[in-house]
Amino acid sequence: MAEELKIVDNRSREDANLSPVNKIEIYSFFDPFNTDCFKLSAIISKLRIEYNQYIRIRHILNPSLKVLTKCQAQSTSDFDNIALAYKAAELQGRLRAERFIHLMQNEIIPKKDIITEEMICDCIINAGLDYNEFKEDLQKSKLTESLKIDLHIAREMEIEQAPSLVFFSEDVHEEGLKVEGLYPYHIYTYIINELMGTPIEKNLPPKIEHYIQKKQLVTTEELLTIYEWPEKLMTKELKKLALQQKVEKLQYPEGDFWQSKMPRI
């Protein structure tokens, strides 16, 4: 564990203007174009399912020069710049903004699609955001200031790569633990249990069809992470859902994906 964890000064969290809560705070720094960040989203989903009452997660688009340069290179204007789009989406709620970025990653990771204004529009609407309000917020200069705040947080926590997770206990005097890169699920649960210091009762995941219906597009690897089933059993269940016309199998260079054919929830 010593090689996987780094200590983070808790002053970083104080600078983030977040009041302490009776939960473990997790800062998730991500790069929307990074495959490992896309894979980590499955682990974060599982953490939310099992430990929802014990954790609070804040997603921060890693505002490094490298990431922001990629965002700028993929855009022709502010309307198709994913970094600014994410900050504008956050103004309508962080959970909806996370939903938006997940839908965007569904487009740009497996399909290798170029970001367009139309793609962003579709993902904004499908994430349950008000598109007209989103367009108005995109034109506000405070989005750039918001990115600068994120950059300050990242520098204070010495974030050097994405994905990176930083864990803080409810004790503001305790230092945080930083995990850089992608690791097996048990590494993250070990940290949560250590920080809680008391026995934790985990929640069970929803029915697999309900999970796919909510996420809309998932990988086989993600489902194996969430449910921890033998691969043969997972394949059998997915084939059954496909026969029931509830899901459709899609094949991309990044692997097999399963797309929901059920109404969005």
Swiss-Prot record:
Protein name per Swiss-Prot or TrEMBL: ClpXP adapter protein SpxH
This protein's GO CC annotations: cytoplasm
UniProt KW keywords: Cytoplasm
Family matches, as InterPro entries: Adapter_SpxH, Thioredoxin-like_sf
Family from the record: Belongs to the SpxH family.
TM spans (from-to): none
Quaternary context: Interacts with Spx.
Entry superkingdom: Bacteria
Annotated source species: Staphylococcus haemolyticus (strain JCSC1435)
Role description: Adapter protein required for efficient degradation of Spx by ClpXP under non-stress conditions. Interaction with Spx stabilizes Spx and exposes the C-terminus of Spx for recognition and proteolysis by ClpXP.
Subcellular location: Cytoplasm
Pfam families: Thioredoxin_5 (PF13743)
